[in-house]
Structures are given as C-alpha cells and as structure tokens.
Design a protein with these regions (language model features):
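Catalytic-site signature of metal-activated, phosphate-bearing donor transferases
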Residues: 30-35, 59-225
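Conserved donor nucleotide-binding strand/loop of the catalytic core
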Residues: 12-31
Length: 225
C-alpha cells in the first residue's frame, strides 16, 4: 500500500518464508483494513494473531505458551501490551540488525488491565474463524479473557526514538482515508514533528526500566542484572 518504512524489504530479508500480500485498500482506512484482515483470517486454521509492524509477541517458551492456550478455557485471549518508550538519559544507540530489537530496548510502560473496565489495549490471539474485531483490533465483539501469564506484546511506540522512527510516524497521516478522518479513526496519525517531540517528552516522564519487573525477568532473564 505504498509504505515507505521498508517493512516489505525487511520481511523479505529476515522472514523470507512469509507470504506478503498487497492491501486491497489504497488508503489507510482502519475499518476496511480490519475487514480485509478478517477475510485473510478465514483462510487459516488454528491460533491467529494480527500485529502491526512495530509489535512483537514475546514469551519465555513458545511451546509452553501455545500449550497453555490449548488448556485454558476460551477461544480468544488478550495479550497485554508494553508501550516501548526510550528513556532519554539512558544513552541508547541506533539499533543493530545483528540482534533482536526487543533485546536492545528495555524501557516502557506495562499497560495493566483495570478490573472494572474492558481491556482494549492488548492484541488478541484466537482460534475462531475470524476475530470479529472492534475497529483497531484491540478488542472484539466476541468474549475474550486477559492472558495473565508472562507474555506481552512489545509495541515500539516512541522507541527507538531516532530519525527513522520519526519519519515512519509522519508517513502514516497523509495516507488516511477521508472516511477515517471524518470518523476520527487514526486521527492521532495526523501530526507534525513538533507534536511528536512534545508527546515523546511527556511519555518519557512515564517510562520505566522493565528489567525491574518480575514478569519481564522471566521472559528476558539474560537482560536483567
């Protein structure tokens, strides 16, 4: 769909066995993209999860993770999200392709569920024919439970905070469909570099060292002091 963040090139290089499909939608329309995603899900059996380019599912043991899904009651689970945000005084350097990005950054905010509210911050994994998603795919019209074992979606939100990430955030807004703009879907993508820097400074005051959290230590024991 005309992406300029090299995501297709990156997939071909690091995941050559992946199937790459061109989107049917020439513009970025959250509703239409979700419908297209669900059409593709109908072609697949077993556990399914839809992630954006900047999102990574991390757990300590993949086999144990899927075994737990099969033994738990339910067909759909929300995996909690960690918003990755660089701590400005930590001295992070630009990422290296020789090491997984999730092992090069360890500051962020764990979005924990509120028992009195529907959790609409994670990503859903399910074995239904499709996800029946709410717009944006953080929630579903199907019932789902929150997966509370040590597994997270690492969303690189304001991390790595370098020129490449800033350009990626700025490229999305101009591709929004008028339908999305009118409905306020994805309006946060319509921004400027000044607004991005202001938001980063705010989120940087909230970011924490994830290595201090027991659940993170289980997933990445080699990164923890």
């Amino acid at each position: 769909r005309g992406s300029t963040d090299r995501s297709v090139e990156i997939c071909k290089t690091f995941a050559p066995n992946w199937e790459i499909r061109n989107s049917k939608s020439l513009e970025f329309d959250a509703y239409l993209v979700d419908q297209e995603v669900m059409e593709i899900e109908r072609e697949i059996t077993g556990w399914k999860m839809v992630l954006n380019t900047t999102e990574f599912l991390c757990c300590y043991n993949k086999e144990q993770f899927f075994k737990s899904l099969n033994t738990m009651s339910g067909n759909m689970f929300s995996i909690r999200m960690i918003m990755m945000i660089d701590e400005p005084t930590h001295g992070y350097t630009n990422p290296r392709y020789s090491s997984p990005l999730v092992k090069q950054r360890y500051h962020g905010i764990i979005i924990q569920p509120n028992p009195n509210q529907l959790y609409l911050n994670g990503r859903l994994i399910h074995n239904n024919s499709h996800g029946n998603y709410r717009v944006g795919r953080h929630g579903s019209h199907y019932p789902y439970s929150i997966y509370m074992e040590p597994a997270f979606i690492f969303k690189f939100f304001y991390s790595p905070w370098n020129d490449a990430m800033k350009k990626r955030k700025l490229q999305i807004g101009p591709t929004l469909s008028q339908h999305s703009v009118r409905r306020g879907l994805g309006s946060h993508h319509i921004t400027t570099i000044e607004k991005l820097e202001k938001k980063y400074k705010y989120y940087a005051t909230l970011t924490t060292d994830l290595r201090l959290f027991p659940e993170y230590q289980i997933i990445f024991p080699d990164l923890c002091p």
